[in-house]
Amino acid sequence: VAKDNGDEVIIVEKAGFFGGTSSKTAGVIWVPNSVFLRDQGISDSKDDCLRYLARFSFPRDYHPDAENLGLRASEYALLEAFYDNASVALDRLIKLGVLDAVEWRMWALDRPTPDYLDNVEENKVAQGRAVGVVDAEGNIGQGIELMGQMDRALKKMGVPVLLKHAADRLVTDDSGRVIGLIAKHGDQEVAIKANKGVIFASGGYSHNTGYVADFQRVAVDGSCAMPVSTGDFLKIASDVGAKMGNMSGAWRMQLPFEQATATRAVPAGVFYVPGDSMLQVNKYGRRVVNEKRNYNDRSEIHGVYDPGKAEFTNHLMFMVYDQRTAEAFAGNFPIPVTPGSDAYTVSGTSVSALSGKLIERLAAISGDTGGVVLDGG
């Protein structure tokens, strides 16, 4: 968009390829009041949408009759900015031919996807806000297609993308105004002059274990984020006086624990839990969550703290399913194609046999779990 406005643009990318973590995702963009809703005559008003966003994002603080809906002014302004600009940005990207965007539909079901919290009064548009892209054959694309379309548009517009260039620090003048950026490329420093400004798109800090320990109350044993997501922007911003906001938030997803101990940068998480004869239990054998809830909200169950036992009771959960689910949903992650063909499932012909296998597995990985054991109490 900046290039189309007549500005000169340089993109600096820390990784050795374009696309980042977005290329690993389903490539779904959540856009209120999108062109696809408007074309269908569906009203997604600002007031209603802000109530929904506040209710879902700040459930502890939300109050429908309070100023700013009970949120801090900065939090409310952030939601306002998202509503005001998301659809405008999408419209512009479509107009420029950057994205071949469509209403995102649920694969074989071929219907609009519902919101993750579609059952509350504040949500007046319970489905249809999700937007995706289609590939050359007209099929719904994933994140790799989304980022591929952006990459091709940048090349067509002549925007240089400097790969393996890690932003290191901002350059400011005597008044504090940002006038440039220093990036590191191998053992070299590259100086880039900024006539108007420097815009950052940060990939988070989930692969900076120091930051994770500092800011996350609940264990983050692995992440789908690219390995380059080490929170570099925090120091860059702090050095020029920027104030940090909420650093404890995370978009969470469950994952097989053994997978995370093998490599912190995991290829995928458990998006939706497959199987209809399946449940998740904690180390006490108690079912404590709706397994079919969306991944981010479902994963919050791992942060439950028991003050009587002084423990995070659900730190590890166990996904238990029968032979029917093992066969009917084979290959739907995390269920393996064939039982035992992965590094994280165990099986038994009875509940007691399965318990015995789990006891053995927990003993083998106790150094990574903090000594979690099954407890019939």
Residue ranges of model-derived segments:
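Conserved redox-cofactor binding core of oxidoreductases
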Residues: 70-188, 209-210, 257-258, 377
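Glycine-rich FAD pyrophosphate-binding loop
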Residues: 4-25
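An anion/pyrophosphate-binding glycine-rich loop and adjacent beta-alpha core
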Residues: 234, 243-374
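Glycine-rich active-site loop/strand segments that organize a redox cofactor
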Residues: 31-81
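Glycine-rich loop(s) and the adjacent beta-strand/alpha-helix scaffold that form part
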Residues: 186-189, 193-261, 306
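FAD-binding core of FAD-dependent oxidoreductases
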Residues: 18-33, 197, 205
